UniProtKB/Swiss-Prot annotation:
Pfam families: FumaraseC_C, Lyase_1. This is Fumarate hydratase class II. The gene is fumC. It comes from Chlamydia pneumoniae. Substrate binds at residues 95-97, 126-129, 136-138, 184, 316, 321-323. Involved in the TCA cycle. Catalyzes the stereospecific interconversion of fumarate to L-malate. PROSITE patterns: FUMARATE_LYASES. The active site is at H185 (proton donor/acceptor), S315. Keywords: Cytoplasm, Lyase, Tricarboxylic acid cycle. It catalyses: (S)-malate = fumarate + H2O. InterPro entries: Fum_hydII, Fumarase/histidase_N, Fumarase_C_C, Fumarate_lyase_CS, Fumarate_lyase_fam, Fumarate_lyase_N, L-Aspartase-like.
């Protein structure tokens, strides 16, 4: 162990770790739970430190030597392999200050080590005076939250969602001529095609994609430059424009300064809104997974309209059983995301005066939702949807047995006669055609001309 000193006194820190006294204090006092600060947030914080150093150098507030040391250390961390030096939990101060200082300390100590200094000496790089220059945890951490959210959405979720839409579109085309019985209220309805049913799923997800893409606009707004309460105290003129320039260059994302710094610190409506779009996606995916589970139920004693891909044995006691496991896994993912949404909403509501103090739990749940949905959609698309096949014989049997084909006769016979024919067929367990013939409503030839399921599916 080595000894480091902060404003409260001496702290012992593991000799081989790059973090310092403030990180160690957080480890000592906030050690519960397995949930670490997401590394996406750590990467975003490192980007901010690198870009802040460059901005401060450009403005003459940091000399080139110190800037180069900070940039070199940041780049090395961004290359990977430093995860063990960022051990802090989500459950810490609500401003994220401890994680901000964790990053400051690691960058400073890495730079010190590279230049032959003593870890924890703060010489020649000081974690506050140099690495955190022109910044406050109160504006740095929300900036990191937005950067992490944008990059996760664009690199993970949006590609996975787009992929699932394309997989569903392929099934729309594959199933376009497979006529089946539609269902409303879980009961038999009029005919449609399986392709039409899948087009509804694809449309749902397209709307979700549009909503998520729209939510990015406010996530591009960054709080950096607000410092402690939004007034920009201790921020040199021109700093915001400079650091935003470097962040855009570093991330290749169109970040802009927040339109209002006071709201940027005190609330996280942009993340609440964006996660609301993720919750909508979870609702849509739950509906789709549930429908497909039921459509393939059986295989002999259920609906049985779809054949599931045989990925793994479904039961430890019943041989030969194949279950909709991907559907169930995705439904659990969606349940978690909907729970996360409530946490994000509650967290967003805790903006006490000038600072929201639930920042870590908001971004933790947001990023978990992105990861779960992204991975869940890819697995569901690849291992389930792509392998779905139609049970054409079952579709035809259902059509032949459906009483709702009587709807096609309503313009000819009227509602009352059609109801009587359908009820007669149901109560006597005969076909609709047999009921119409027995009642003398139509001849067999007339019935066959009027009741053609393929002509009842429309052009949608």
């Amino acid at each position: 162990m080595r000894q480091e000193k902060d404003s409260l006194g001496i702290v012992e820190v593991p000799e081989d770790k790059l973090y310092g006294a403030q990180t160690m204090r957080s480890r000592n006092f906030f050690s519960w739970g397995p949930e670490l600060m997401p590394y996406e947030v750590i990467r975003a914080l490192v980007w901010i430190k690198k870009c802040a150093a460059q901005a401060n150098q450009d403005l003459g507030f940091l000399d080139s030597k110190h800037c180069d040391m900070i940039v070199a250390a940041a780049d090395e961390i961004l290359e990977g392999g430093f995860e063990e030096h960022f051990p802090l939990k989500v459950w810490q101060t609500g401003s994220g200050t401890q994680s901000n200082m964790n990053v400051n300390e690691v960058i400073a100590n890495l730079a010190i080590r590279h230049h032959g200094g003593v870890l924890g000496s703060k010489d020649p790089i000081h974690p506050n005076d140099h690495v955190n220059k022109s910044q406050s945890s109160n504006d740095v951490f929300p900036t990191a939250m937005h950067i992490a959210a944008v990059i996760s959405l664009k690199n993970k979720l949006i590609p996975a969602l787009d992929h699932m839409i394309r997989v569903l579109d392929a099934k729309v085309e594959e199933f376009r001529h497979d006529v089946k019985i539609g269902r409303t209220h879980l009961m038999d309805a009029v005919p449609m095609t399986l392709g039409q049913e899948f087009s509804g799923y694809s449309s749902q997800l397209r709307h979700c994609l549009e909503s998520i893409a729209f939510s990015l606009a406010h996530l591009y707004e960054l709080a950096i430059g607000a410092t402690a309460v939004g007034t920009g105290l201790n921020v040199p003129e021109g700093f915001v424009e400079k650091i935003i320039h470097y962040l855009r260059k570093e991330t290749d994302e169109p970040f802009i300064p927040a339109s209002n710094y006071f709201s940027a610190l005190s609330c996280h409506d942009a993340l609440v809104d964006a996660h609301g779009s993720l919750a909508t996606l979870a609702c849509a995916l739950t509906k789709i997974a549930t429908d497909l589970s039921f459509l393939g139920s059986g295989p002999r004693c259920g609906l049985g309209e779809l054949f599931f891909p045989e990925n793994e044995p479904g039961s430890s006691i019943m041989p030969g059983k194949v279950n909709p496991t991907q559907c169930e896994a995705l439904q659990m993912v969606c349940a978690q995301v909907l729970g996360n949404n409530q946490t994000v909403i509650i967290g967003g509501s805790r903006g006490n005066f000038e600072l929201n103090v639930m920042k870590p739990v908001i971004i933790y749940n947001f990023l978990q939702s992105v990861d779960l949905l992204s991975e869940g959609m890819r697995a569901f698309s690849e291992f389930f949807v792509k392998g779905l096949k139609v049970n054409k014989a079952r579709l035809q049997d259902n059509i032949n047995n459906s009483l709702m084909l009587v709807t096609a006769l309503a313009p000819v016979l009227g509602y009352d006669k059609c109801s009587k024919a359908a009820l007669k067929a149901f109560h006597e367990s005969i076909s609709l055609k047999e009921a119409c013939l027995a009642l003398g409503y139509l001849s067999e030839k007339e019935f066959d001309r009027l009741v053609v399921p393929e002509n009842m599916v429309g052009n949608h």
